UniProtKB/Swiss-Prot annotation:
One GO BP annotation of this record: carbohydrate derivative metabolic process
The protein's name in its UniProt record: DnaA initiator-associating protein DiaA
Cross-referenced Pfam families: SIS_2
Annotated family: Belongs to the SIS family. DiaA subfamily.
Organism of this sequence: Klebsiella pneumoniae subsp. pneumoniae (strain ATCC 700721 / MGH 78578)
Keyword field: DNA replication
Known role: Required for the timely initiation of chromosomal replication via direct interactions with the DnaA initiator protein.
Gene name of the record: diaA
């Protein structure tokens, strides 16, 4: 059992090292995309399923409240938090539309959709991205594996942050770290510390 625990830590560290080599440019571009949208008076909509929903919710909470620094709240909405809306849409046999309907109702040109999907194939996330495209929104996609169907929907202005792993647990861990990096970059770009 101890060897298995050590193997989990080792694999996680190896994934972090690979991601540290592969992802800084994409994370930087994503952060600047989010910052520019906020500076233009727009908002960030975010969505995911399961652990990805938790990561989306963490991002929105860190924008609205704060990440590590006291600052004014920033407009972000986690689309997976309103159970009444989600179940109303799903109850009409539109489970694949639970996020897309919200994107069409709340999203505007200049807003950003932060779409989080471990494999990039979740139908409701794919539909949300398709809806965001029709609303002239920019997409920041956090994926893994081969990027799935989601990767093929992205345009030149969009950013994919694809975790270099084929293990869901490692991808989800790195999505959380990536969300924290994005929050840190947004805070330090919009509200630079005097002592930095």
């Amino acid at each position: 059992m101890l060897d298995r625990i050590k193997a989990c830590f080792t694999e996680s560290i190896q994934t972090q090292i690979a991601a540290a080599e592969a992802l800084p440019d994409a994370i930087s571009r994503a952060a600047m995309t989010l910052v520019q949208s906020l500076l233009n008076g727009n908002k960030i909509l975010c969505c995911g399923n399961g652990t990805s929903a938790a990561n989306a919710q963490h991002f929105a909470a860190s924008m609205i409240n704060r990440f590590e620094t006291e600052r004014p709240g920033l407009p972000a909405i986690a689309l997976n938090t309103d159970n009444v809306v989600l179940t109303a849409i799903a109850n009409d046999r539109l489970h694949d539309e639970i996020y897309a309907k919200q994107v069409r109702a709340l999203g505007h040109a200049g807003d950003v959709l932060l779409a989080i999907s471990t494999r990039g194939n979740s139908r409701d996330i794919v539909k949300a991205v398709e809806a965001a495209v029709t609303r002239d929104m920019t997409i920041v996609a956090l994926t893994g594996y081969d990027g799935g169907e989601l990767a093929g929907l992205l345009g030149q202005q969009d950013v994919e942050i694809r975790i270099p792993s084929h293990r869901s647990a490692r991808i989800q861990e790195m999505h959380m770290l990536t969300v924290n990096c994005l929050c840190d970059l947004i805070d330090n770009t919009l509200f630079p510390h005097q002592d930095d």
